[in-house]
Amino acid sequence: MSQTSTLKGQCIAEFLGTGLLIFFGVGCVAALKVAGASFGQWEISVIWGLGVAMAIYLTAGVSGAHLNPAVTIALWLFACFDKRKVIPFIVSQVAGAFCAAALVYGLYYNLFFDFEQTHHIVRGSVESVDLAGTFSTYPNPHINFVQAFAVEMVITAILMGLILALTDDGNGVPRGPLAPLLIGLLIAVIGASMGPLTGFAMNPARDFGPKVFAWLAGWGNVAFTGGRDIPYFLVPLFGPIVGAIVGAFAYRKLIGRHLPCDICVVEEKETTTPSEQKASL
């Protein structure tokens, strides 16, 4: 298979995997907000976590199941991921999230309309932000912009560090097929503990793609600003990227360097030609 066709298949996998996790997660929130479903924070967090686990099972063998631009960037910087694939992966992830949000909206369309009519909500007003939160994340009204950024950075750093730990066969017993479920459980635990603060985005694609859809679907600028002076979309867009870089750096320097093998070093040795190895002596 050519490199081009391989990249195409990987991008399709990232599109479908990211779309799948958004379909389950946003669908759960839509059921809560407009269909009268009774979910607590833990139940919502578990559904998001299981959605991620299912998406990983679907795509891991094709693309590695990044499903998150922050993860893709961190793996490029700290785990030898091919830099030429970074932009295509990110575009695929955002597109998958956008399309899944649109699909959920289409399936729940009548319920959204009836909910707005019943509660006299004008789409695009500040009062409609809570309903826009069906698709993407907005902060608790009691925390400010900087605090929200710090929350997203910290929880994504924890997520990234533990993803590397859970998928590193050199770090204890190999997890194999259990790794996706453990990652899903990790997301559920983070969501249950920190979700009430920012909605635990931890994923620029998960947040930005659906925000773009909400903007197009009538929520307008409030979808990006969240009704705040500083556009809130910047927090779940850049906070997770910074956090993932910090988490990957911390794992590599504090844990990974003390393990028996170094993945990047091994890969570099395997790709070095005999003449290059001789020249390096």
UniProtKB/Swiss-Prot annotation:
The record marks W48, F200, R206 as: Substrate discrimination. The chain crosses the membrane at residues 6-34, 40-60, 85-108, 144-169, 178-194, 232-254. The lineage of its organism: Bacteria, Pseudomonadati, Pseudomonadota, Gammaproteobacteria, Enterobacterales. Pfam families: MIP. The gene is glpF. A motif (NPA 2) lies at residues 203-205. The remarkable property of effective water conductance combined with a strict exclusion of all ions including protons is mediated by two conserved asparagines which force a central water molecule to serve strictly as a hydrogen bond donor to its neighboring water molecules. Assisted by the electrostatic potential generated by two half-membrane spanning loops, this dictates opposite orientations of water molecules in the two halves of the channel, and thus prevents the formation of a 'proton wire', while permitting rapid water diffusion. This is Glycerol uptake facilitator protein. It is found in: Cell inner membrane. CDD domains: MIP.
